[in-house]
C-alpha cells in the first residue's frame, strides 16, 4: 500500500499527484462495455454462473437460465470461486485454489451534511473502532458534485472468513455509526443523510511465504479453461494500473497459446 501511494507521486521531489474519474468507475465500465458492444462483443450481465465444465470437445458454461457452449473459458473470479465452479479440475488443483488466503472488505458509504476530519484519508489503529480507514472523498472531488453534501467511505479490511460477513446491513450500519461518533463526538445523527453497506469476501489474495509457488497458473488441467485473477499480481499493490497490466500481459500470452 505504501509503495502504491509513493508511486503515485510525481517528480524528483515526489509531490502528491492524485486524481479521480468524474462519476466514478461506473463511467469507465459503461464506456468499456459500449466500446466492446460496438466491436461485436456480446455482453451478458445478471447471469450468475453455477458450473463451468468440459463436455466432449467444448467448454460449457451453465447459468440458472441456460447452458452456453464455447471453445474456451477465462475465469477472472477469485481462486476459491474457481474451485467451486469447476468440478472437472483435479482434486489437488481445486485444493490449491481453496488454500489461497484472501482479504475481503466491508464498506459503509455515507452522505453527510458536514465534513469529518478534513483529511482525504485517515488510517485508524484503535481496535475499538469497527472500520480501518476514513476516506473523505469530498476533500478531493468537491462537495458540489454531491449536491452540496459530503461523501465519505468507511472501509473495514478483514479475512474472507470474518464473522462480519454474516452480519446484516443494519448491524454493520449501527456498529459503524457508533464508531464514527466515537471518533467525532460532535457528529449528530441528523448529519448522516444516507448510509449504504457493501461487502466483498474476496478482494485480494494475501501474499504469504513462498507465495509465487502457490500462485495459480493461467492454464488449468482442463483443456480450454484458463484463470486470470488478482491472485496472479505479485510485487505490486492491487491497483487499477496493476490490474490492467495483468490483463494486458495475460491477453498476449493467451493469444499466443491459442494460436498454436
Per-segment meaning from a language model:
Residues 151-155, 218-236, 242, 246:
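Short FAD-binding loop at a beta-strand-to-alpha-helix junction that anchors the flavin cofactor
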Residues 243-260:
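Internal hydrophobic alpha-helix adjacent to the cofactor/substrate pocket in enzyme cavities
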Residues 1-51:
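Active-site/ligand-binding neighborhood in enzyme catalytic cores
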Residues 45-166, 170, 174-187, 198, ...:
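Mid-domain catalytic core of redox enzymes
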Residues 21, 25, 29, 169, ...:
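Generic structural signal for well-ordered, non-membrane alpha-helical segments
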